[in-house]
């Protein structure tokens, strides 16, 4: 009997490890929330908030998982496409940028929505609309910034730690066996070779050219190619500086942007709406819908990258990111 009990104890542990109970609610579909106003037409406000990536956030105890910004925009734009009352779209941006591809995909989705839906799209930069955030803003017909907003930071960045010296100090040595000379390209365990640095710079230059092309194509009336090149050294601009340099179309408050969009539509009344997950969310035009993908602490670029939220897998992360 004693032997049987000893046998059952590890068996129970094995069976327990096979049982998984989810105590976080499932992600619910987006629901429309009226922020303000009245009337038949709707002006939809969508938030691009925090670092732009393909990574969402798993739910904790009693909280829903949160899709990535890319997934959120796709879901929201599909929902808006089928609503015949949507008369205009405002992308409210508060982002330092993020992944190159994630930024480009959101830009593409908004551009495709605008062409198919045939409604005006405004980008409103609330606090920060830098690098990838500014890239996404190029999908809009008009870019407006809050008087105290920061924008710009046109460029590409890629970073790594070189920990070879640290490993040597603690007596740890890494060995790599590879099929080709560049298989461990950009490894943190050794300094990069001149050839590798040149290869990486070539990739960055190509992605930078893409950024320049997108801005050039969408800011034809405000910027010449030579003017844009002079501004595209990675620096940020205040709203006033951005307006003077042709990077934005207007410096105004959000209420003014909404009024301006109504005027362009030839209407005086409209419901301003957003899409959010069901919650105790109390809506105003300044409320961020409760589906943030990054916490306040994670909004600074380096923390997000090295905490794994932007680049969860090994490799080089190419970023359209303002990273002070």
Predicted regions and their residues:
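Short gly/pro/ser/thr-enriched loop/turn and capping motifs at secondary-structure boundaries
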Residues: 130-131, 150-154
């Amino acid at each position: 009997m004693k032997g049987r009990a000893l046998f059952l104890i590890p068996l129970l542990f094995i069976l327990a490890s096979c049982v998984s109970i989810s105590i976080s609610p499932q992600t619910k579909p987006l629901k429309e929330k009226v922020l303000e106003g009245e009337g038949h037409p709707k002006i939809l406000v969508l938030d691009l908030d925090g670092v732009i990536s393909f990574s969402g956030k798993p739910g904790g105890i009693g909280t829903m998982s949160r899709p990535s910004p890319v997934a959120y925009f796709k879901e929201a734009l599909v929902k808006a496409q089928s609503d015949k009352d949507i008369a205009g779209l405002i992308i409210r941006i508060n982002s330092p940028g993020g992944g190159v591809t994630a930024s480009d995909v959101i830009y593409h989705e908004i551009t495709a929505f605008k062409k198919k839906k045939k409604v005006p799209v405004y980008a409103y930069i609330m606090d920060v609309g830098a690098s990838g955030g500014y890239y996404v803003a190029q999908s809009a017909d008009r870019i407006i910034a809050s008087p105290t907003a920061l924008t710009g930071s046109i460029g590409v960045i890629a970073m790594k730690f070189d920990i070879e010296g640290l490993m040597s100090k603690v007596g740890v040595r890494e060995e790599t066996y590879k099929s080709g000379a560049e298989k461990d390209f950009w490894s943190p365990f050794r300094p990069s070779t001149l050839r590798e640095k040149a290869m990486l710079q070539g990739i960055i230059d190509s992605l930078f050219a893409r950024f320049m092309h997108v801005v050039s194509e969408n800011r034809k009336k405000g910027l010449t190619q030579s003017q844009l090149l002079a501004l595209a050294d990675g620096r940020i601009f205040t709203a006033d500086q951005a307006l003077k340099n042709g990077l934005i179309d207007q410096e105004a408050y959000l209420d003014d942007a909404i009024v301006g969009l109504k005027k362009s539509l030839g209407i005086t009344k409209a419901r301003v709406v957003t899409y959010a997950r069901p919650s105790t969310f109390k809506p105003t035009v300044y409320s961020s819908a409760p589906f943030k993908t990054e916490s306040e602490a994670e909004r600074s670029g380096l923390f997000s990258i090295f905490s794994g939220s932007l680049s969860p897998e090994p490799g080089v992360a190419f970023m359209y990111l303002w990273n002070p």
